Amino acid sequence: MILKAAVENDLAREVLTAHTYTTSATEQHPEGITISNWFLRRIEDKDTKGTVVCAKTGFVAQSGNCAASYEETDSGKHYICVTANAHSSWRCIYDHVAVYQEYTK
């Protein structure tokens, strides 16, 4: 539900769909801060039966490497995939690829 709401918010969608995003300038960071979405860069060449347009990753001790991604298919269907407890950050990518390959129509 959080990712669905984020996709519907213009600023959140802009940040989550960008491979790199630079924040607005502040006194501490006059050039802004550049954020890189490694999930999008790593999944873009994988066969997911659609296009993963945005994603957010994270890590906490209780649930390990986690990721949420949003995919759009050529037929216009939209899918959200959420995974947790991957043993590595790369494994998050392959978990999402496997889920999209299995369930995307």
What are the residue ranges of the model-derived segments?
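Penicillin-recognizing serine hydrolase domain
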Residues: 1-105
